[in-house]
From Swiss-Prot:
Binding site for Ca(2+) 3: 240, 250, 287, 289
Subunit structure: Homodimer. Interacts with the oligomeric lectins MBL2, FCN2 and FCN3; triggers the lectin pathway of complement through activation of C3. Interacts with SERPING1. Interacts with COLEC11; probably triggers the lectin pathway of complement.
Name recorded for this polypeptide: Mannan-binding lectin serine protease 1
Residue(s) carrying (3R)-3-hydroxyasparagine: 164
Keyword set includes Metal-binding: yes
GO cellular component: extracellular space
Annotated control of activity: Inhibited by SERPING1 and A2M.
Species of the source: Rattus norvegicus
Gene that produces this protein: Masp1
Residues under site feature: Cleavage: 453-454
Coiled coil location: none
Length: 704
């Protein structure tokens, strides 16, 4: 039973009747819940009083009654004052007495429940009360009847499933059944069953339980034309029969076109049936009696057989079967390192199908060895084959190498690539990516002769400074030097890359910068004016000044020039290395350029001097009296007695030294500024590369 709350649906109704009449009185109650109190409650009730409350609730509900207070005169068998609860033909309970002392006669916590939708409550007091009694306070409510439980064994119960709801119930059926018009019984729905698979199983409803009565079932097997269906009944076969008349009640019948098998019934299953058709109808009928288990059959479809297949050379066929028939499909694939070739098209697999006429949908393809094709061209590198006839097929090997001695392979990988089964050249480390050839830096082919004591510099030997770049106006007039970094960057002085500023207001604006089309870069240059067969003229793509460059003090006097195209590296063109560690005082460095070199005239060819690096504080002290500032991003070099220095026209040029351990030349500084070229105690001031190395590498991506 479920208790119901209708407070949200109905206004609370309280019946409190105070009757003074001696004669009987009847009250009709039709609400879903309410309150009943003795006359005069909570005062004492009158003598010789009788009140009856008739409580009626809707069908599908019962009346539930309980007492909150009970105080009546006590008597044997409740002969004097009492409360009687009854239905039409049955007394449900009789109560009297005090709930504090007469626990056996009072209702206490007892709940009275009517069997139906009606309950009558009668209060009766006799002619006298020796004491004061306050009567009773009772409440009633309608509660739902669970018809599913109470009708479980009745004839009107549901066939399959019963569902209770507030005030009623309804029936439903198992899957495959439909509810009868009586809303109680279930009948089977077994018509229109369609089977389209090549194999399957069909049974009577509820098999192996007894099949439903009054059934008209139909099953259709409908396959593609070209299949022929065979039926096989299982051993358990039980359809109601008659000893004299064949299959008068229940039976199963098979139809295929104009052919008919059956009807079948009894306990002996039919023999296998070869229908020779792709469309079959199975009809099953039962009457309204009997408890037979039914039947079960399996069906299988077969088609015309196709010729046996032979796999291609270096290939296989899946699945491998002794016989292939209509609709069977096979997948042709090749061994590792081979691909399927069909009609000049290369593919991983190829599928064919057995047709209804017994022929295959296509011919068997061939298996062709994987060819990785001509290897990609490596920039600044070359490729060699492992075979004489330059094979590029599966498992063939090639080796990439860089153009030596001007380029080297990044990470020192082997450069060996193998043709993979996927048709790609693959390296163990780099996979499908090509290696990278980096320019070799600081290793010129030509070595210098001893020049440490050459006064006022000397002509440089051609090829000993292959990293030097000439910044030239379009008319061929040089105006600064630079150093090649990597394959397409030139490092120079920032002051070389902008027009002169107003001395009174030396503020650099974008409008002061040179345009990339204003000048060009010449590599491999030896003679200042005369053309050289080894020189290369390169266009400028982009220029960038150091973000902290100060044109007034020459702090961070560095600029980068990006080239539109990379120069060809050779004996006369090679980048210089970036420093790995700071430079120390006394280290001998070489400065190169096409400046005046104290001759008060420009030289015909490239000049160079060898000078020592000067102590930072010594250089500061030399320039402080002149009001010049030497900062931490600068480095000084020169002889105390003078005579060797970079002069006008050398700006931006390289100051280099040789790393004895690595036998490579690296860039120490860039010619920046000075005072009184080559005079005593007047050292050359250069932009120091080491503290600016991070900025250079971040912009250019150059690594040694």
């Amino acid at each position: 039973m479920r208790f119901l709350s209708f407070r949200r649906l109905l206004l609370y109704h309280v019946l409190c009747l105070t009757l003074t009449e001696v004669s009987a009185h009847t009250v009709e109650l039709n609400e879903m819940f309410g309150q009943i109190q003795s006359p005069g409650y909570p005062d004492s009730y009158p003598s010789d009083s009788e009140v009856t409350w008739n409580i009626t609730v809707p069908e599908g509900f019962r009346v539930q009654l309980y007492f909150m207070h009970f105080n009546l005169e006590s008597s044997y068998l409740c002969e004097y004052d009492y409360v009687k609860v009854e239905t039409e033909d049955q007394v449900l309970a009789t109560f009297c007495g005090r709930e504090t002392t007469d626990t056996e006669q009072t209702p206490g916590q007892e709940v009275v429940l009517s069997p139906g939708s009606f309950m009558s409550v009668t209060f009766r007091s006799d002619f006298s009360n020796e004491e004061r009694f306050t009567g009773f306070d009772a409440h009633y409510m309608a509660v739902d009847v669970d018809e599913c439980k109470e009708r479980e064994d009745e004839e009107l119960s549901c066939d399959h499933y019963c569902h209770n709801y507030i005030g009623g119930y309804y029936c439903s059926c198992r899957f495959g059944y439909i509810l009868h018009t009586d809303n109680r019984t279930c009948r089977v729905e077994c018509s229109g069953n369609l089977f389209t698979q090549r194999t399957g199983t069909i049974t009577s409803p509820d098999y192996p339980n007894p099949y439903p009565k009054s059934s008209e079932c139909s099953y259709t097997i409908d396959l593609e034309e070209g299949f022929m269906v065979t039926l096989q009944f299982e051993d358990i076969f039980d359809i109601e029969d008659h000893p004299e008349v064949p299959c008068p009640y229940d039976y199963i019948k098979i139809k295929a076109g104009s052919k008919v098998w059956g009807p079948f019934c009894g306990e002996k299953s039919p023999e296998p049936i070869s229908t020779q058709s792709h469309s079959i109808q199975i009809l099953f009928r039962s009457d309204n009696s009997g408890e037979n288990r039914g039947w079960r059959l399996s069906y299988r479809a077969a088609g015309n057989e196709c010729p046996k297949l032979q796999p291609p050379v270096y290939g296989k066929i899946e699945p491998s079967q002794a016989v292939y028939s209509f609709k069977d499909q096979v997948l042709i694939s090749c061994d590792t390192g081979y691909k399927v070739l069909k009609d000049n098209e290369v593919m991983d697999t190829f599928q064919i199908e057995c047709l209804k006429d017994g022929a295959w949908s296509n011919k068997i393809p061939t298996c062709k060895i994987v060819d990785c094709g001509v290897p990609a061209v490596l920039k600044h590198g070359l490729v060699t084959f492992s075979t004489r006839n330059n094979l590029t097929t599966y498992k063939s090997e090639i080796r990439y190498s860089c153009q030596q001695p001007y380029y080297k392979m990044l990470h020192n990988t082997t450069g060996v690539y193998t043709c993979s089964a996927h048709g790609t050249w693959t390296n163990e480390v780099l996979k499908r990516s090509l290696p990278t050839c980096l320019p070799v830096c600081g290793l010129p082919k030509f070595s210098r002769k001893h020049i440490s004591r050459i006064f006022n510099g000397r002509p440089a030997q051609k090829g000993t400074t292959p990293w030097i770049a000439m910044l030239s106006q379009l008319n061929g007039q040089p105006f600064c030097g630079g150093s090649l970094l990597g394959s397409n960057w030139v490092l120079t002085a920032a002051h070389c890359l902008h027009h002169p500023l107003d001395p009174e207001e030396p503020i650099l604006h974008n409008s002061h910068l040179l345009s990339p089309s204003d000048f060009k870069i010449i590599m491999g240059k030896h003679w200042r004016r005369r053309s050289d067969e080894d020189e290369q003229h390169l266009h400028v793509k982009h220029i960038m000044l150091h973000p902290l460059y100060n044109p007034s003090t020459f702090e961070n006097d560095l600029g980068l020039v990006e080239l539109s195209e990379s120069p060809r590296l050779n004996d006369f063109v090679m980048p210089v290395c970036l420093p790995e560690h700071p430079s120390t005082e006394g280290t001998m460095v070489i400065v190169s350029g096409w400046g005046k070199q104290f001759l008060q005239r420009l030289p015909e060819n490239l000049m160079e001097i060898e000078i020592p690096i000067v102590n930072y504080h010594t250089c500061q002290e030399a320039y402080t009296p002149l009001g010049k500032k030497v900062t931490q991003d600068m480095i000084c070099a020169g002889e105390k007695e003078g005579g060797k220095d970079a002069c006008a026209g050398d700006s931006g040029g390289p100051m280099v030294t040789k790393d004895a351990e690595r036998d490579q030349w690296y860039l120490v500084g860039v010619v920046s500024w000075g005072e009184d070229c080559g005079k005593k105690d007047r050292y050359g001031v250069y932009s120091y590369i080491y503290p600016n190395k991070d900025w250079i590498q971040r912009v250019t991506g150059v690594r040694n």
